[in-house]
UniProtKB/Swiss-Prot annotation:
Organism of provenance: Synechocystis sp. (strain ATCC 27184 / PCC 6803 / Kazusa)
Gene name as annotated: fabH
Protein name: Beta-ketoacyl-[acyl-carrier-protein] synthase III
GO CC aspect terms: cytoplasm
HAMAP family (alphabetical): FabH
PANTHER family: 3-OXOACYL-[ACYL-CARRIER-PROTEIN] SYNTHASE, BETA-KETOACYL-[ACYL-CARRIER-PROTEIN] SYNTHASE III, CHLOROPLASTIC
Length: 330
C-alpha cells in the first residue's frame, strides 16, 4: 500500500498495430501447419507483422500519441517515458527515439527488458517515480517486433508471435489506483524461452580474440512454459489480491499476457474466475510480448467494457523466467 500520501491513475491508453496481417492460412503456405492445428492449440486466427517501413519506434510513437490524446495531454506534459521491450531498434535504447518522435522534449526516457512481463514491470516501476513526487506524468510503452527474430521454418514458434505496441499515461494524484503489485524472477528457468546471442570468436591479434556474433531466432520449450504459467500466474494474482485486501469476486476484469488461449483458460479455471471476465484478443493479434497487455487493455476501454471504477488484475509472464502482477482501479 502507498504510505507516501501520493498515488497515481491511468488517464489514457493507446495502441499501434503492425501494417501486415498474417493469417493462419498464410502460415500454412509457409510451413506445414493448418488453421485448425493453430487454433486448437493456441486460439490464434491471425497476427500482424511489420513491413520494412515500420519499426518499434514508429509503433511506439503511434501508441503514445493515442494515449496522450485520450489523456488530453501534449507530449511536452510528460516527465518520463519508459519503454518495455525485448526487441529494440537499437541496442543502446529505443525509448529515446520514441521521445524524439513524440516531441516530448521535457521527458527523460529509458528502456527496460522483462520480456512478456515488461509492461506490468514498467507500470510498477513508473509508480515509484510518481508516488515519491519525482514526476507528475509518465508514459509507459510496451512494444515488440518479434517477427524479426522468428524462425519461419519452425511451426511450433512461428505461428505464435505478432508485432505491436500499447501505451498508457499515468498521472500523479492523491488517491492511489495501483492497489498492489508483485514481481518475481526465477533464473534457473532461463533456458525455457530465449532469444540468445551467439558469439563467433574473431581474432584481433595472435593472442586476443573478440566474441562478435548475432542474435539467434526465438527458441521455446512450450511444455515447460505452459507448466510455469499455469502454476505461477494464479499464485501471483492471489498474492496481489491478498495485499490489496480483495478476493477474485471483487475483480471486474482480468487481463493476462496474451500468450495462448489455453494458458488463459487454465489460469481462469484455477482461480475460479468466469471466462467472461478474462479479456482476450489473442485470436486477433497473437502473442505480442510486452505489447499484449496494453493492447488488450486499450481495446477493452475503447469498446466500453472497462469503465471508471472497475477493478482490474494485470498479470504478465514469460522469459527470464519472470512474472509480475498488479491490481489497478480504472
Amino acid at each position: 500500500m502507498n504510505t507516501l500520501g501520493s498515488g497515481l491513475k491511468i488517464i489514457g491508453s493507446g495502441t499501434a498495430i503492425a501494417d501486415q496481417s498474417l493469417t493462419n492460412q498464410d502460415l500454412s503456405n509457409i510451413v506445414e501447419t493448418s488453421d485448425e492445428w493453430i487454433q486448437s492449440r493456441t486460439g490464434m486466427r491471425q497476427r500482424y507483422i511489420c513491413s520494412a517501413q515500420e519499426n518499434l519506434a514508429s509503433l511506439g510513437v503511434k501508441a503514445g500519441q493515442k494515449a496522450l490524446a485520450m489523456a488530453g495531454l501534449q507530449p511536452e506534459d510528460l516527465d518520463l517515458i519508459i519503454l518495455a521491450t525485448s526487441t529494440p531498434d537499437d541496442l543502446f535504447g529505443t525509448a529515446a527515439q520514441i521521445q524524439g518522435g513524440l516531441g516530448a522534449t521535457r521527458a527523460f526516457a529509458f528502456d527496460i527488458t522483462a520480456a512478456c512481463s515488461g509492461f506490468v514491470v514498467g507500470l510498477n516501476v513508473a509508480a515509484q517515480f510518481l508516488r515519491t513526487g519525482v514526476y507528475q506524468r509518465v508514459l509507459i510503452v510496451g512494444g515488440d517486433v518479434l517477427s524479426r527474430w522468428v524462425d519461419w521454418s519452425d511451426r511450433t514458434t512461428c505461428v505464435l508471435f505478432g508485432d505491436g505496441a500499447g501505451a498508457v499515461v499515468l498521472q500523479r494524484q492523491a488517491q492511489d489506483n495501483l492497489l498492489a503489485f508483485e514481481m518475481y524472477t526465477d533464473g534457473t528457468g532461463n533456458g525455457c524461452l530465449n532469444l540468445s546471442y551467439q558469439a563467433n570468436p574473431q581474432p584481433l591479434t595472435a593472442e586476443k580474440t573478440v566474441a562478435q556474433g548475432t542474435y539467434q531466432a526465438i527458441t521455446m520449450n512450450g511444455r515447460e512454459v505452459y507448466r510455469f504459467a499455469v502454476a505461477k500466474v494464479p499464485e501471483i494474482i492471489e498474492k496481489v489480491l491478498f495485499k490489496a485486501q480483495l478476493t477474485t469476486s471483487d475483480l471486474d476484469w482480468v487481463i493476462l499476457h496474451q500468450a495462448n488461449q489455453r494458458i488463459m483458460d487454465a489460469v481462469g479455471d484455477r482461480l475460479g474466475i468466469p471466462s467472461e471476465k478474462i479479456i482476450s484478443n489473442v485470436g486477433e493479434y497473437g502473442n505480442t510480448s510486452a505489447a499484449s497487455i496494453p493492447l488488450a487493455l486499450d481495446q477493452a476501454v475503447r469498446e466500453g467494457k472497462i469503465k471508471e471504477g472497475d477493478l482490474i488484475a494485470l498479470a504478465g509472464f514469460g522469459a527470464g523466467l519472470t512474472w509480475a502482477a498488479s491490481i489497478v482501479r480504472w
